[in-house]
C-alpha cells in the first residue's frame, strides 16, 4: 500500500501565553473550536486551515521556517490586519507566481499569507 497524503490537517505552535495567542489568531480570522484562555491546548479554524496552540510557558522561540496560508485578495487581508494594529510586512510579488506577506505571531512563529497571481 502506498499512502497518499491529501493535505496538512493542522499545524501546532508552542505558545507561552494562551490568552495572548488566542487574541492574535482571532485577529487573523481564526475561530476557536476547542480550549480557551486558560487551556493548555486550543484548536482554531479559518476556512479549511486549522491551527493548534500548545501551552509551553518556558518556550524559547527560534526560527524554524514558516506556515503558509492561501488567501484571496492578499492586499485587502493585509490592510485588515494592519487596521487592527498588527504589524504584517508589506505584500510583495514572488517570481513563482504568488503575492504574499509575512507576519510573526507573539511567540515568533512566522506566518505567510499568499494568493496566486494570475
Report each predicted region and the residues it spans.
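Conserved acetyl-CoA-binding loop of GNAT-fold acetyltransferases
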Residues: 26-33, 85-86
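Vicinal oxygen chelate
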Residues: 16-18, 67-110
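Residue-level marker for the onset of beta-strands and adjacent loop->beta junctions
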Residues: 9, 39-40, 65, 97-99
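Short glycine-enriched loop/turn motifs at secondary-structure junctions
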Residues: 4-7, 59-64, 94-95
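Conserved short beta-strand elements that form part of the metal-binding/catalytic scaffold
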Residues: 31-65, 110-115
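N-terminal beta-strand motif that seeds the catalytic metal site of vicinal oxygen chelate
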Residues: 1-20, 67, 116-118
Amino acid at each position: 500500500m502506498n499512502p497518499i497524503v491529501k493535505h496538512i490537517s493542522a499545524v501546532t505552535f508552542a505558545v507561552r501565553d494562551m490568552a495572548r495567542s488566542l487574541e492574535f489568531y482571532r485577529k487573523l480570522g481564526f475561530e476557536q473550536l476547542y480550549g480557551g484562555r486558560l487551556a493548555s491546548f486550543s484548536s482554531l479554524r479559518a476556512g479549511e486551515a486549522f491551527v493548534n496552540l500548545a501551552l509551553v510557558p518556558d518556550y524559547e522561540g527560534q526560527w524554524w521556517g514558516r506556515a503558509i496560508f492561501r488567501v484571496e485578495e492578499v492586499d485587502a487581508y493585509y490592510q485588515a490586519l494592519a487596521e487592527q494594529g498588527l504589524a504584517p510586512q508589506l505584500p510583495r510579488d514572488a517570481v513563482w507566481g504568488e503575492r504574499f506577506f509575512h507576519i510573526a505571531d507573539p511567540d515568533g512563529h512566522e506566518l505567510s499569507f499568499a494568493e496566486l497571481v494570475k
